[in-house]
Amino acid sequence: MALSTNTTTNSLLSNKSLLQNQPLLSSPSKNAFFSNKSTKTVRFVQPIAAVHSSDSNKNPIVSDKPTKSSPPAATATTAPAPAVTKTEWAVDSWKSKKALQLPEYPDQEELRSVLKTIDEFPPIVFAGEARSLEERLGEAAMGRAFLLQGGDCAESFKEFNANNIRDTFRILLQMGAVLMFGGQMPVIKVGRMAGQFAKPRSDSFEEKDGVKLPSYRGDNVNGDAFDVKSRTPDPQRLIRAYCQSAATLNLLRAFATGGYAAMQRINQWNLDFTEHSEQGDRYRELASRVDEALGFMTAAGLTMDHPIMKTTEFWTSHECLLLPYEQSLTRRDSTSGLHYDCSAHFLWVGERTRQLDGAHVEFLRGIANPLGIKVSDKMDPSALVKLIEILNPQNKAGRITIITRMGAENMRVKLPHLIRAVRRAGQIVTWVSDPMHGNTIKAPCGLKTRPFDSIRAEVRAFFDVHDQEGSHPGGVHLEMTGQNVTECIGGSRTVTFDDLSSRYHTHCDPRLNASQSLELSFIIAERLRKRRLGSQSTLGQ
């Protein structure tokens, strides 16, 4: 299991298939990543032996339970999903499709050299870990687990240090404990970490004082300083991003399995600046109750030495955006014969790149990682059904997570139609709320921010809609940090517009700080508790 000591060795990661070792220019390109220069002949490399940490003999979860039916709503006009024309997939077949949001590298030869180097690097994650996560997400789809996915909007090279990684991991541990206690169900902890660098942009260029330069697309592409050198896409940044991702994951593994995440340490996870806050007080009260329960278990003769009490499972995720990099880290698993993108356990396709005939969907349909689909109020129900069919033709539970980002009012109007369309198609998905992206505003000072009240309202709308539709609220997806930043306004320790500039450190979008994140987790835990008690009372009738 991911980042856990109770793992089993089960298979080897083979070297890439012949298709994968073909030159990067073997298919015509429709984007500026590639030129028409010839490349070297195919290389044959010895297979890479890598330990998988989950049981490869387990089949992915496929629900054998009939899905709930609901009468069609008068306003929902979704037709059955049309048949999808299948073409043969290859690791580079995305190049035959239109690829959006890719930077233009001026030095194509250097780009090819860098991608070849990354192609020969070891995988960052293992296929067995991704399969294990898919199984857990399958449980969330059935209402038997809850996904907590969070981390930076975009990781940066400048803020890369052990303390920042530890603090984000620690607040996720705290939030996971709160959610698990309230929901009385497993919490699947997935970080937007160890690879969340690239960001899509509304415009390819940015103009200031008559100077027009390429937009900042994340530290793995270019720099955020507004000068020609910084804004020119640099292939060497891809290698630095790989190294930082590997180092981040290495530290996360140590935290998850080295005793730091042991449940007995629950009272020690409080961050210093939340210690004397309302949320810190609530957390200490919860931690004391957990301590009492652990003491009772010890007195009853139940051992605290079991790995489940000493370690935690933790997975990584990022948006699948920079396709040449993702291709270079794709490996064929020798056990299953399937391809896995070994840059992360979980990848998602964004609002700007989820076109049915686009390059990103083409790439993702061929990899076996669990996938997310970001969905706004602009998503047509029939298009969502077709996209799910393309990405999950076998209808495996845990394969697809729908991450909704709409704003509270749009959520109440639009989400029911999406749920009904997916249900009518018989598709199994995990429904998750992203209450961040639909609530971004500009403060009077010009900085982007997000009101905590709006974030809370969207989370409540998400739960209300699922209560109404009889479906399962499967998780939450947050842009957050363990640092004491002032980027989102509101919360119990009220951050005002005037406070924003004091600790506004984000490289992209505003994040919840640790106190706001913990406060939101208590709100979600209360909704999970009410659902649990309501379900129990229904069973008792």
Swiss-Prot record:
Sequence segments annotated as region (Disordered): 54-81
Any GO BP: aromatic amino acid family biosynthetic process
Gene3D superfamilies, sorted: Aldolase class I
Feature: transit peptide: 1-74
Keywords attached to this entry: Amino-acid biosynthesis, Aromatic amino acid biosynthesis, Chloroplast, Plastid, Transferase, Transit peptide
Localization per Swiss-Prot or TrEMBL: Plastid, Chloroplast
GO cellular component, one term: chloroplast
GO molecular function: 3-deoxy-7-phosphoheptulonate synthase activity
Its EC number(s): 2.5.1.54
Reactions listed under catalytic activity: D-erythrose 4-phosphate + phosphoenolpyruvate + H2O = 7-phospho-2-dehydro-3-deoxy-D-arabino-heptonate + phosphate
InterPro entries (UniProt xref): Aldolase_TIM, DAHP_synth_2
Function: Involved in maintaining the supply of chorismate for the biosynthesis of the aromatic amino acids and other chorismate-derived metabolites.
NCBIfam families: DAHP_synth_II
Assigned protein family: Belongs to the class-II DAHP synthase family.
PANTHER family membership: PHOSPHO-2-DEHYDRO-3-DEOXYHEPTONATE ALDOLASE, PHOSPHO-2-DEHYDRO-3-DEOXYHEPTONATE ALDOLASE 1, 2
Record protein name field: Phospho-2-dehydro-3-deoxyheptonate aldolase 2, chloroplastic
